[in-house]
């Protein structure tokens, strides 16, 4: 005692001797000795003998002793650590209910890596503290275990190299060995899961111990029953897959198969990867046939392209890997060829078949996705070479397809026809006709389907038996029922009427039928039958403009020109103006060629020109009409027609070309005086940038008529329409005009006007409004004649321009 007590300590000695239960006195004594570790420990020991249940003092003392071991190797200085261990045991003997004491002890034991001590401390702590504190103790243990265990494999074994897996299963030694199981950690976790709130989290940690037998046992005891009891069935995929991995490692094939099936039901999007996982398990077990069977069966049932691709690719790689591994082995051990020869040949055949059947397997997938898609069935037919196989596909298609779900016109009819064509090509025409009969009883959604079948059947009869047989087939199809309008209305209003009920309205069949009739004999009977067929299409309101034209031409070929023109008359009344335009073009051309009376032709032209009121550009008819009148010597009438054409033109290009033609025609045929009123109207009707061309042209006409003042007034007007920079032709002509007819004053006035126009239009560059209607031209010495031939009054007022 003397070695620890100094003269300065006597006061503290007296105080602790007088009051040994005073924590304050002991704390002061300890504080006075803080610079000497041995003395501090001596005082703490005396204090704790006096106050053995004082946890605060124990905590200070234990933390003080543990700080002394900071940075010290627990192995080299095991004795020192053991001293602290004994202190902890003394502490918890008197403070068993203090959970903080146990946690501090656990931390010290974990620092030493003493697993046996950790387990002893945990056992004692769980006995000492209350049940409510057990989870707190376990949290420290679990945290320690997490530090001990390796990180979890993110792929949980899904990405094992298949080549090495096959090699290891076949010949051993090549596959990677499982890491050793951490039995201590798995045992601790197995105890902890009984009180843990999140069993799946504990299972994830248990997986990292590689003690797969324990993983299986824990999952089946603590996770699976809870899931079933709550009727959830949806614990995380990762949790279930850890169970599968554990079953795989323990070789529990039967359990694994059941678990994979259950997991695939809960997580259907994971079905392909689960199938591949199970296939790998069979590879490890050496059960290659079962591996192939599972993959092949999955290929036949999957309905997703991505799943199909992953399964197919894995199966191909498996077969390739197995063949490659066996070949490598035989290169090193040729004496084993007899042992592996049969297996090698079988798997080579399986690989060849798998590659050869890829298109067929892919088609199977498409048909599972869209069993009513006719195109997929037609594609499937092309995958077979033998007629019997093709016929089987057609039969399967017909039995499988839902006719009501069809959305592509003509596809279903194509399927039926190709089915019949198969027997036709094989010389079994009667069987083919039986198939066609059945095909025509199918409730198609679209007219194109029965239409195709009737057309193909008639074409086949035409090749085999001639025109009459083909016409007989078509006439049967085209029988018009009395209530044809009602049937068509119901079909077109989508009242679930099969297309076969309105086959009589097929323009394609009628056109084919008419072609056959026209190709038949020249008898009057056939003439009437042909006309009746044409009339039927008109009655059914399915006749096209081309059909009307063909009808008219047919009658012309038979010498019935007048009757053919009546067909044109009916056609132009039926179709809208845009369509009737083409018919009128043909009609008028043929009427002119045939030489109808002039008045009748004029009536045709006038009727055709009514289309202009409906917005149709009738320029060709106006020109043809004008030419007709000119050829008949009606010059002014032709001019009037061209004038009407200018007014009726729909586009600017048409207006310009027609005004140019009209004005040139009038000048040449009727003289410049006649053209004056037309020029004035033309300039009014066209925008400034176009009208200025005609103003200049008009001025030249007036100059030619010696009307200098009128020509100058026109030039003055035209000069104001555009900026001089955009009106160079007019200004150039005007300058020469003044040199020919003017004087100094008129030339000066011209230049003055040019400056004013430049100033006026320089700002925005826009032309002035066209005001030709407000201009009174200088009087002409000639009387004016309008296009209608009537004399116009002379305007005696000169033009005054506001300069």
Curated annotation (Swiss-Prot):
It is found in: Nucleus. It comes from the Eukaryota. Transmembrane segments: none annotated. GO terms for biological process: generation of catalytic spliceosome for first transesterification step; mRNA splicing, via spliceosome. InterPro entries: HAT, HAT_Syf1-like_N, HAT_Syf1_central, HAT_Syf1_CNRKL1_C, Syf1-like, TPR-like_helical_dom_sf. Disulfide bonds: none annotated. Keywords: mRNA processing, mRNA splicing, Nucleus, Repeat, Spliceosome. GO terms for cellular component: cytosol; post-mRNA release spliceosomal complex; Prp19 complex; U2-type catalytic step 1 spliceosome; U2-type catalytic step 2 spliceosome; U2-type post-mRNA release spliceosomal complex; U2-type prespliceosome. Its main location: nucleus. HAT repeats lie at residues 3-34, 35-67, 79-111, 113-147, 393-425, 427-463, 482-519, 525-557, 559-593, 596-631, 633-668, 670-704, 708-740. Associated with the spliceosome. Involved in pre-mRNA splicing and cell cycle progression. Belongs to the crooked-neck family. This is Pre-mRNA-splicing factor SYF1. It comes from Eremothecium gossypii (strain ATCC 10895 / CBS 109.51 / FGSC 9923 / NRRL Y-1056) (Yeast). The gene is SYF1.
């Amino acid at each position: 005692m003397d070695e620890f007590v100094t003269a300065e300590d006597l006061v503290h000695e007296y105080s602790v001797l007088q009051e040994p239960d005073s924590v304050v006195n002991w704390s002061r004594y300890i504080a006075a000795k803080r610079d000497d570790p041995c003395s501090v420990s001596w005082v703490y020991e005396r204090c704790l003998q006096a106050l053995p249940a004082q946890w605060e003092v124990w905590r200070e003392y234990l933390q003080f002793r543990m700080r002394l071991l900071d940075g010290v190797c627990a192995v080299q200085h095991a004795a020192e650590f053991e001293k602290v261990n004994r202190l902890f045991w003394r502490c918890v003997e008197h403070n068993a209910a203090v959970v903080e004491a146990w946690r501090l002890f656990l931390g010290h034991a974990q620092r030493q890596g003493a697993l046996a001590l950790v387990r002893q401390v945990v056992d004692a702590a769980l006995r000492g503290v209350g049940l409510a504190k057990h989870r707190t103790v376990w949290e420290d243990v679990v945290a320690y275990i997490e530090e001990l265990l390796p990180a979890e494999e993110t792929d949980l074994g899904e990405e094992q190299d298949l080549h090495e897996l096959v090699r290891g299963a076949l010949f051993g030694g090549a596959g990677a060995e499982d890491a050793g199981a951490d039995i201590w950690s798995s045992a601790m976790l197995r105890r902890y899961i009984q009180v843990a709130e999140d069993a799946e989290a504990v299972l994830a940690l248990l997986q990292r111990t590689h003690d797969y037998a324990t993983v299986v046992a824990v999952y089946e005891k603590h996770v699976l029953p809870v899931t079933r009891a709550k009727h959830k069935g949806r614990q995380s995929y990762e949790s279930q897959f850890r169970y599968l991995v554990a079953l795989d490692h323990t070789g529990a094939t039967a359990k694994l198969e059941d678990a994979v099936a259950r997991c695939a039901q809960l997580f259907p999007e994971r079905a392909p990867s689960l199938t591949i996982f199970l296939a790998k398990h069979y590879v490890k077990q050496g059960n290659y046939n079962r591996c192939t069977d599972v993959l092949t069966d999955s290929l036949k049932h999957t309905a997703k392209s991505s799943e199909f691709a992953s399964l197919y690719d894995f199966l191909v790689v498996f077969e390739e890997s197995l063949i490659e591994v066996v070949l490598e082995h035989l290169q090193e051990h040729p004496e084993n060829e007899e042992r592996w020869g049969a297996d090698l040949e079988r798997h080579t055949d399986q690989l060849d078949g798998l590659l050869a059947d890829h298109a067929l397997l892919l088609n199977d997938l498409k048909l599972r996705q869209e069993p009513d898609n006719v195109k997929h069935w037609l594609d499937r037919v092309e995958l077979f070479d033998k007629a019997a196989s093709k016929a089987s596909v057609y039969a399967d298609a017909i039995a499988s397809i839902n006719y009501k779900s069809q959305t592509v016109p003509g596809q279903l009819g194509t399927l039926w026809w190709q089915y019949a064509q198969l027997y036709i090509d094989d010389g079994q025409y009667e069987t083919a006709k039986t198939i066609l009969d059945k095909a025509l009883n199918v409730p198609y959604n679209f007219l194109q389907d029965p239409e195709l079948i009737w057309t193909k059947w008639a074409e086949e009869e035409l090749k085999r038996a001639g025109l009459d047989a083909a016409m007989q087939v078509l006439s049967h199809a085209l029988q018009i029922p009395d209530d044809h309008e009602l049937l068509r209305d119901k079909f077109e209003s989508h009242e679930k009427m099969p297309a076969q009920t309105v086959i009589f309205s097929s323009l394609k069949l009628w056109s084919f039928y008419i072609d056959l009739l026209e190709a038949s004999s020249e008898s009057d009977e056939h003439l009437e039958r042909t006309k009746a067929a044409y009339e039927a299409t008109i009655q059914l309101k399915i006749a096209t403009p081309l059909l009307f034209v063909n009808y008219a031409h047919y009658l012309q070929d038979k010498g019935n020109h007048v009757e053919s023109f009546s067909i044109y008359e009916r056609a132009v009344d039926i179709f809208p103006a845009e369509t009737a335009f083409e018919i009128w073009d043909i009609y008028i051309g043929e009427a002119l060629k045939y030489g109808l009376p002039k008045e009748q032709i004029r009536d045709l032209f006038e009727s055709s020109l009514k289309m202009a009121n409906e917005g149709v550009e009738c320029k060709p008819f106006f020109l043809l009409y004008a030419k007709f009148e000119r050829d008949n010597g009606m010059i002014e009438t032709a001019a009037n027609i061209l004038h009407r054409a200018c007014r009726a033109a729909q586009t600017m290009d048409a207006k310009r070309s027609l005004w140019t033609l009209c004005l040139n025609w009038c000048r040449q045929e009727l003289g410049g005086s006649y053209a004056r009123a037309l020029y004035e109207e033309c300039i009014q009707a066209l925008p400034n940038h176009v009208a200025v061309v005609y103003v200049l042209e008009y001025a030249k006409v007036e100059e030619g008529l010696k009307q200098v003042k009128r020509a100058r007034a026109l030039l003055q007007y035209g000069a104001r329409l555009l900026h001089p920079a955009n009106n160079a032709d007019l200004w150039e002509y005007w300058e020469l005009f003044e040199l020919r007819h003017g004087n100094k004053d008129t030339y000066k006035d011209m230049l003055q006007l040019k400056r004013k126009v430049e100033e006026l239009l320089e700002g925005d560059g826009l032309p002035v409004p066209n005001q030709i209607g407000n201009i009174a031209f200088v009087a002409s010495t000639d009387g004016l004649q309008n296009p209608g031939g009537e004399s116009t009054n002379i305007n005696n007022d000169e033009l005054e321009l506001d300069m």
